[in-house]
């Protein structure tokens, strides 16, 4: 994929759907080099549809939103044509709409599948070397290993967010997006 030694990771559509979370995970991958993000056209298409239907974004706005992954991780694209053909995705998830995500994780050699979706069969994916986890769990552990790097990263994300926002607003958004333990650790570290 990109050639880094970092573990490969898939952001499920529910994570890409959250701009604050997918940008945070992207910054962790790109800035701290803790992950090597992989994606597929199928994943981007699913997220685009959800953004148009649920957030009522225009097609163009949704395309720009999901364009973050190919723009920042061009080597992370995984072609799913015939990928993981020997694997029955129905044995990996309860949701047929997530079959392509399972194929992406296996075909790309991903170590992590970041999601809040409980429909994935964790033990079945683990047999393929894929750990299904919420971003919060990964971020908390990674923060403990590199707190200064995370504080710098969060300051940059807050500065870039909508023309610059206070760090407290960014952490509140991260918490609302499902990474409350991580946001709490960062608040303490920032003295908020």
Outline where the language-model segments fall.
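Active-site neighborhoods of divalent-metal-dependent phosphate/nucleic-acid chemistry enzymes
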Residues: 74-112, 165-166, 176-192
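Acidic, PIN/NYN-like endoribonuclease modules and their adjacent C-terminal/linker elements
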Residues: 118-192
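Extended, non-globular alpha-helical segments
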Residues: 45, 49-74, 137, 144-161
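PIN/NYN-family metal-dependent endoribonuclease catalytic core
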Residues: 19-54
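Residue-level detector of structured alpha->beta connecting loops
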Residues: 33, 109-110, 129
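Metal-dependent nucleic-acid phosphoesterase active-site entry motif
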Residues: 1-25
């Amino acid at each position: 994929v990109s050639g880094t030694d970092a573990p490969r990771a898939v952001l499920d559509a529910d994570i890409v759907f959250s701009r604050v979370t997918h940008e945070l995970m992207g910054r962790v991958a790109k800035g701290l080099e803790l992950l090597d993000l992989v994606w597929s056209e199928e994943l981007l298409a699913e997220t685009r549809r959800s953004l148009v239907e649920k957030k009522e974004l225009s097609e163009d706005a949704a395309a720009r939103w999901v364009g973050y992954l190919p723009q920042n991780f061009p080597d992370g694209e995984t072609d799913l044509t015939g990928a993981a053909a020997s694997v029955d995705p129905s044995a990996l998830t309860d949701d047929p709409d997530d079959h392509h995500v399972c194929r992406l994780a296996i075909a790309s050699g991903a170590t992590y599948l970041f999601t809040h979706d409980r429909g994935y069969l964790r033990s079945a994916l683990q047999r393929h070397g894929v750990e299904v986890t919420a971003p919060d769990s990964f971020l908390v552990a990674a923060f403990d290993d590199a707190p200064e790097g995370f504080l710098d990263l969060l300051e940059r994300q807050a500065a870039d967010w909508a023309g610059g926002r206070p760090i407290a607003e960014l952490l509140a958004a991260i918490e609302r997006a499902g990474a409350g333990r991580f946001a709490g650790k960062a608040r303490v570290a920032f003295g908020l």
